[in-house]
């Protein structure tokens, strides 16, 4: 069972000189809300792709930590005719279940990215979230007067979630929030700065995962504003774990 945890991701990661793609598993298993939740970070060498466009039963989020890459969204297991969109550090894409997709590194430097991958009981909803891109450079500005400044990026039902919610938060030095528990799993990717949670300091590219029902708080313990992405995984099992 996956529980609340903090993962340090120290860049640069070592590349694979043969395969040109190397995944580093962080965790994988069931949570109180999901049949399976997995997370890994990968490094992809310049000029390479890990596979042709493929599809699977799980839903995914891919967040660029360092570098940039092209995301290909296709109708089948081929690259011809695919929609191509370039993502840079701090940007991400959501893939619904069974969407053909792949990543391709065209620039001259490696790209490092983190992925959440999950499945659960089907959510009883009609209008589902389709493939969705967020570009860091298009993020709404934070309020200059607020110590804790979250900005909603999107929230929408998916095939396995009553709601997938994403927001970007700026946290000024000394600001934070007290421990509380949520009725959903939360994944956080720190983009910059230093925060403290669960008695641990988390810096840029660090991962925080809060399991539903477990207490957690956060505080900026650095000298600069911290910025992080937050993903809330609202499960149809919610009534069973409240």
Locate each region found by the language model.
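Short beta-strand His + acidic residue motifs that chelate non-heme Fe in jelly-roll/DSBH
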Residues: 50-53, 71-72, 83-84, 95, ...
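A short hydrophobic beta-strand segment most commonly corresponding to one strand
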Residues: 41, 61, 109-124, 209, ...
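Conserved short histidine dyad/triad with adjacent acidic residue
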Residues: 21-28, 40-56, 154-155, 163-182, ...
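Structural motif
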Residues: 48, 61, 68-70, 100, ...
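A short, N-terminal "cap"/entry segment at the start of jelly-roll beta-barrel domains
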Residues: 1-36, 88, 112, 116-163, ...
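Short, conserved beta-strand element in jelly-roll/cupin
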Residues: 43-44, 55-71, 75, 118, ...
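Short acidic-glycine-tyrosine-enriched beta hairpin
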Residues: 76-96, 197-216
């Amino acid at each position: 069972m996956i529980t609340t945890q903090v993962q340090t991701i120290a860049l640069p990661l070592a590349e694979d000189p043969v395969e040109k793609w190397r995944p580093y598993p962080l965790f994988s298993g069931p949570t109180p809300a999901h049949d399976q939740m997995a997370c890994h970070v990968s490094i992809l060498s310049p000029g390479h792709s890990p596979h042709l466009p493929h599809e699977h039963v799980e839903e995914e989020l891919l967040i660029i930590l360092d570098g940039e890459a092209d995301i290909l969204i296709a109708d089948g297991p081929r690259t011809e005719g695919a929609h191509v969109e370039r993502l840079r550090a701090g940007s991400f894409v959501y893939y619904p279940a069974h969407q053909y997709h792949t990543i391709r590194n065209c620039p001259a430097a490696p790209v490092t990215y983190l992925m959440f991958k999950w499945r659960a009981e089907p959510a009883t909803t009609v209008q589902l979230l389709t493939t969705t891109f967020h570009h860091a450079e298009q993020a709404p500005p934070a309020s200059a007067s607020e110590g804790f400044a979250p900005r909603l990026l999107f929230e929408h039902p998916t095939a396995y979630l009553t709601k997938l919610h994403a927001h970007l938060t700026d946290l000024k030095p000394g600001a934070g929030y007290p421990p509380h528990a949520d009725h959903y799993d939360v994944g956080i990717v720190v983009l910059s700065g230093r925060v403290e949670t669960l008695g641990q300091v988390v810096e840029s590219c660090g991962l925080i995962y809060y399991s539903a029902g477990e207490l957690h708080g956060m505080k900026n313990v650095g000298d600069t504003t911290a910025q992080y992405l937050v993903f809330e995984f609202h499960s149809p099992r919610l009534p069973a774990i409240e």
